[in-house]
């Protein structure tokens, strides 16, 4: 399940650097999208790539793409339902 991130909620862009996006919502919450790419520990040719979602400085969820040699291997989503509830409240 992919949680839709509606950027219309963003009131202003606070910071944009590299692939990290940080913005403030209409009600003053800070949302951060942080890109990551790391080698997978158990297989040298695998990389874990994706975005981490932070709300008000707390890690809430991440979307992962498992890649090898630049090709998509499989994808998964790890989240907790608080993220859905808090974004709806924004």
Predicted regions and their residues:
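Intrinsically disordered, low-complexity repeat segments enriched in small/polar residues
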Residues: 6, 28-30, 70-71
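Intrinsically disordered, low-complexity, charged/polar segments
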Residues: 53-90
């Amino acid at each position: 399940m992919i949680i839709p991130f509606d950027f219309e909620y963003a009131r202003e862009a606070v910071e944009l650097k590299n692939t990290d996006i940080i913005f403030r919502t209409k009600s003053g919450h800070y949302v951060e999208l942080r890109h990551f790419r790391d080698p997978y520990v158990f297989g040298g040719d695998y990389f874990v790539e994706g975005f981490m979602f932070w709300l008000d400085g707390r890690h809430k969820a991440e979307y992962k793409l498992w890649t090898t040699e630049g090709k998509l291997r499989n994808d998964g989503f790890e989240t907790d339902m608080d993220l859905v509830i808090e974004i709806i409240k924004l």
